[in-house]
């Protein structure tokens, strides 16, 4: 691999595979672990998720600034060590307080990686088509995620703490390996003359804000990201409940309801890997793809599949549209990231990508309670329909982004 491709590209693919494997292994049975080992009640479970999302939201911008001021490579390494520390803390110390603290630690680690990784590979591989790089990275992440789900499930049947601890250990090991092999040759700090961390942070924040305001395409793409965040939380939180409450899950041999969800996850990942490969093959044949068409069609397809999933009552029909909805998101995200990359100043890449991640988290924080309230007061299907409606503004924003020029 290292002989055929550049070192940075190979390291990027290795990172996406191993990191996804470790995180999937650690989290695949996290709710079961929290219920059976830590013995959390319903309120505590919700609080764990809230602390995690809030940590990601609060740390996203500061860590992006660190990556653009000091080093994207260093930011990724810090993130991996925080990932490992957070998972080890959660798995080794099964108490509510340490689980909450672990969410803060690995949530902070996630923000050190988000934005910095994309900015690092975009700078190191300026001559490669970034759409293909992001799609191939997404594909490797999905393959690692599938393996992580399988390993996590097998290990969890032995001991529920084991996959969390081993996943954390793998994150630490990956951090050590990256410290030896991860290059950084094209980085230049966003601010050459330093005035102290706080002043540098404020200065870069103002530069970033001014740049985004003066870039209409980027501003529109960030608004599309916010819409995606608004429409993701309801789908992620309510889809399982919709399967359990509004249809009959067939029992086929060993496939009970619990096993079915693992199988569905694996099928979804497999479809994502295949779709990414087909899109990469099309890019290699034609040289490029229309980002406007891809983002528009996948957004519209996601809305349609979500509505059909909400009104469905047949298990097989619901399974089909559920998988298609997930596929739409899998295809859209790397293409949207590549589109955004083309309108970002090189020195502020990590900060802008972190802003995108922050808007996605903000959308989830806002959209989740709205959809949850509708599901609680009316019904789960109506909550899912509400989720679809929250993405509708994106259908008007995508053509606008396609026509504008920075």
Regions found by a protein language model. Name each.
Residues 2-57, 217-265:
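Helix-loop boundary and gating motifs at the non-cytosolic
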Residues 81-95, 300-313:
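C-terminal ends and interior cores of transmembrane alpha-helices
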Residues 104-143:
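Cytoplasmic helix-loop-helix junction between adjacent transmembrane helices
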